Amino acid sequence: MYNIFQLKNNHLFRINEKDKISFLNNIIWIDIIDSCGDGHNYIPNILLHQKIKFFELKDINKTTRFFKDKNGLHIHSFFFSYNSQEQIDNSSVFFTIHNGCLYTSRKKEFPVFCMYQKYLHNHLLINGNAYELLLNLFEVKLDDLTNKIEHIYATLETLSSVIMNGQQIDEYDHALSDLAILENIGWKIRVNLLDTERAIKFLIRKVKLPVSQQKYANDILNEITLLLPHNEYVFHQISSLTQSAMGFINIEQNRIIKIFSVIFLPPTLIASSYGMNFKFMPELQWSFGYPSAIILMILSGLAPYIYFKYKNWL
């Protein structure tokens, strides 16, 4: 599957790849999804076919994530995606800029790309080149990461209310599970931020950008610098809430241990009483004395157990 875009009046317009394309020089972005397929075969225009074939057949160095060679500038960057369990995951996108055209190759749809392509009419390319388009995508990526951090903040506030209440111990399992999930997302956000920072620094170092794009790239770097402390605070807050939850759980466990001690005290007391070797013990002469003692021990242990179970203390 391909998404092909032309530049007209500094705006991007999607092209239907089955149509005849007459302005190949204005093609600025070819977005390839699942590039291992043979979808380029149905594109009728020979020159466009060669462009896409070039991108699919060129040898991409899988171990080097940022490099420049005769085929152009190459950047291998991470973006958020969702796996089959609808969990957030980091997936790779290959970027190549060759002859003024941006080629992107990815295995599936990413929220950032869908978001950007959905509102193309709002994106004005001032310089109208592939580098500006690449910076646009990284900016949208940062906006998405910012939204994720804000969502984590909101979720942590809700979890904080549950944990600090200290009265809903039965909900702590879910709270601790949610904290672990948020911590995992936080680490992936950090990886994305550092990865984007490296990619933009590489772009600045390897390409002589116009002054406006140089400033644009530096603004994105500054935004990353501002987001990193917020992401670090997420880890601090998660650690604090986890320790608080574990503290309440330990208190509850100690309380339950005390309750168990109380539960087994009555039958132990009864058993100890009838274990005394005194000569005068009327119950020893009763034919029903032993069964009565056993029943009394069972009832004295069972009654507190049922009561504590009813109170959700066990």
From Swiss-Prot:
Keywords linked to the UniProt accession: Cell inner membrane, Cell membrane, Ion transport, Magnesium, Membrane, Transmembrane, Transmembrane helix, Transport
**What reaction does this catalyse?**
Mg(2+)(in) = Mg(2+)(out)
Major localization listed first in the record, in broad terms: membrane
Site note Essential for ion permeation, residues:
254
One Pfam family name from the record? CorA
Q: Which GO terms describe its molecular function?
A: cobalt ion transmembrane transporter activity; magnesium ion transmembrane transporter activity; nickel cation transmembrane transporter activity
- Determine the domain of life of the protein's source: Bacteria
Q: Where is this motif: Probable selectivity filter?
A: 275-277
NCBIfam families, per the entry: corA
Query: Which family is this protein grouped under?
Result: Belongs to the CorA metal ion transporter (MIT) (TC 1.A.35) family.
Q: What does this protein do?
A: Mediates influx of magnesium ions. Alternates between open and closed states. Activated by low cytoplasmic Mg(2+) levels. Inactive when cytoplasmic Mg(2+) levels are high.
Oligomeric state and interaction partners are given as: Homopentamer. In the absence of Mg(2+), interactions between subunits are weakened, and dimers, trimers and tetramers can be observed in vitro.
Name of the protein described by the UniProt record: Magnesium transport protein CorA
Q: What is the phylogenetic placement of the source species in the record?
A: Bacteria, Pseudomonadati, Pseudomonadota, Gammaproteobacteria, Enterobacterales
